[in-house]
């Protein structure tokens, strides 16, 4: 597999799949980049430590501060305590939250990602009003304001002729 194909594959995988958490996975928030593919994270237990980014993500996916990642702990090493298993985007965060596996310490950040928070609304409706088709009462109200046209009015408009003068054109032959 060429480098470009690998990059495209990883980018599509991160952007399109929902991640299923495994028992030893830890959800963490990226605090800062330490350089050399090392990142400092704050995990769901409140511990702060350094994790490494695996080679499959390097040069194809970039991390931002306060972004969420799934970390798999590693036993060897003194400074590096884990490896990034998956980079969570907004859809994955909301999906894990719906499953009930989202840590309570990051709940406030997950609430900011919901549709209601972005719109500044708080509602318990399953479907937003703007996603529903218009009701019949709204259609009746709109139709009352419209004018109705008779066929006789249309025929009268067609019979009218206008004499216009255009100096750039030759005179039309008379009938």
Swiss-Prot record:
Protein name: Probable RNA-binding protein EIF1AD
GO MF annotations in UniProt: RNA binding; translation initiation factor activity
Superkingdom of the source species: Eukaryota
Record's compositionally biased regions (Acidic residues): 129-163
Entries under PANTHER family matching the protein: RNA-BINDING PROTEIN EIF1AD-RELATED (PTHR21641:SF0), TRANSLATION INITIATION FACTOR-RELATED (PTHR21641)
One Pfam short name: eIF-1a
Gene Ontology annotations for the cellular component aspect, listed alphabetically: nucleus
Homology family: Belongs to the EIF1AD family.
Positions of region (Disordered): 116-175
Keywords, comma-separated and alphabetical: RNA-binding
Cross-referenced InterPro entries: EIF1AD (IPR039294), NA-bd_OB-fold (IPR012340), RNA-binding_domain_S1_IF1 (IPR006196), TIF_eIF-1A (IPR001253)
Regions of compositional bias (Polar residues) in chain numbering: 165-175
Gene3D superfamilies: Nucleic acid-binding proteins
Biased composition (Basic and acidic residues): 116-128
Positions of the S1-like domain: 5-89
